[in-house]
A protein has these predicted regions:
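Post-transcriptional modification and biogenesis factors for structured RNAs
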Residues: 1-277
Length: 277
């Protein structure tokens, strides 16, 4: 087993480059790190270019035997703890990461889904990752993100998704208003959160809706608000006026899930339960 001992190794330097968005975009690759997400990548049949393993961590037997059996089938690179420390973004690394080639997924919006989630300027990687995880938990297969939303393949985003990133088609919109208008032409209505409304998130039927989640500081952009069909707010019992973007997204997505399972919406619409296969 050959072990890389130098941080100046060309392969190690190429991995370090993937910490920057411009190189992730140029090479169409990104990094995942940690035992669980590497296992998820294998399970989801992600295109793993190679796995990097810290020699010392392997000697400590912290890896599951079944995982090591699967990893052994891949292109594995072994490095010293010093070299691994130079490429990790985690304060307490588990000693394993992988370089993933981005899947060649369609950038066309699928209008067959009940609900489309759109992100309008989400900046925090943790929020973006949590929203992707929530979208996956609702069995939604796509998300549309504006140009000014954080990079979905940022390492913090990827960690926050807990593997959901392998199951969701992330569609980057170069012209969000144009894409939203096309969604309306395909029978969808646009729902945004706003403070200047008396309508609650619990008052509407979520079938064939586009749920737009806005920027953490400024909310949904004015241009998007102007073409919205429904403005809603999340009822607050305390003095707080707004919620974290990922929390707000979770509340709205799970109101859709509740209705999907046979609940009644505030407008009186009753949904027959439709269980996803």
């Amino acid at each position: 087993m050959q072990v890389i001992t130098s941080k100046d190794n060309e392969l190690i330097k190429s991995i370090k480059k993937l910490k920057e968005k411009k190189y992730r975009d140029a090479y169409n690759k990104y990094i995942i790190e940690g035992i669980k997400i590497v296992g998820e990548a294998i399970q989801e049949k992600a295109d793993i270019e190679y796995v990097v393993i810290c020699e010392d961590c392997m000697n400590e037997n912290i890896f599951d035997k079944k995982l090591m059996y699967e990893i052994a089938k891949l292109n594995c690179i072994y490095v010293t703890s010093k070299v691994f420390a130079s490429i990790t973004d985690v304060s307490n690394p588990q000693g394993i990461l992988a370089v993933i080639k981005r899947a060649e997924k369609s950038q066309k919006i699928n209008y067959k889904e009940d609900v489309i989630i759109v992100l309008d300027g989400i900046q925090d990687p943790g929020n973006l990752g949590t929203i992707l995880r929530t979208v996956d938990s609702a069995n939604l297969k796509q998300i549309v993100i504006s140009n000014d939303t954080a990079d979905a393949f940022n390492s913090k985003v990827v960690r926050s998704t807990m593997g959901a990133i392998f199951r969701i088609n992330i569609i980057k919109s170069d012209d969000l208003i144009k894409d939203l208008i096309n969604m309306k032409k395909n029978g969808f209505k646009i729902v945004v959160t706003a403070l200047d409304t008396n309508d609650s998130v619990y008052d509407i039927d979520y079938m064939k809706k586009v749920i737009v989640i806005g920027n953490e500081a400024n909310g949904v952009s004015q241009e998007v608000q102007e073409i919205a069909d429904n403005k809603v707010k999340i009822p607050m019992l305390g003095k707080t006026e707004s919620l974290n973007a990922s929390v707000a997204a979770g509340i709205m997505i799970y109101e859709y899930v509740r209705l999907k399972l046979g609940g009644v919406s505030g407008d009186g619409a009753f949904w027959q339960p439709i269980f996803c296969q």
